Amino acid sequence: MALKIRLARGGSKKRPYYQIVVADARSPRDGRFLEKLGSWNPMLAKDDEKRIELNAERVQHWIAQGAQPTDRVMRFLDQAGLAKRPARNNPTKAQPGKKAQERAAEAKQKAEEAAAAASEAAAE
């Protein structure tokens, strides 16, 4: 049985509240779980101590049993010092293509030349 430490959504519409639970990976998001490990209330201020509550001892127990935390829960565990979050791969997909980069460099160069010409004209 593959175990996950994940968030189960509660609360009402537009007022989210999450329980941090250990559940079988195949069970529904808000379905049956084995144990509640804590809670996360995203409506509270980021510096509020009750925003994220974790039972550190039980979290360590379930990780030792092989439970895999999800990305968001891993962030919480990293903040609490219970686990180390690995560095993420940051692909360069968001960069423009070669032609667009060349055009941007040319435009920047023209702007610099125009600024230099304007400063020379103002100096005379």
Curated annotation (Swiss-Prot):
GO terms for molecular function: structural constituent of ribosome. Keywords: Ribonucleoprotein, Ribosomal protein. InterPro entries: Ribosomal_bS16 (IPR000307), Ribosomal_bS16_dom_sf (IPR023803). Residues 80-124 are annotated as: Disordered. The keyword Calcium does not apply. One of its GO terms (cellular component) is cytoplasm. The keyword Zinc does not apply. Residues 99-113 have a biased composition (Basic and acidic residues). One of its GO terms (biological process) is translation. Residues 114-124 have a biased composition (Low complexity). NCBIfam families: S16 (TIGR00002). Belongs to the bacterial ribosomal protein bS16 family. This is Small ribosomal subunit protein bS16. It comes from Rhizobium meliloti (strain 1021). The gene is rpsP.
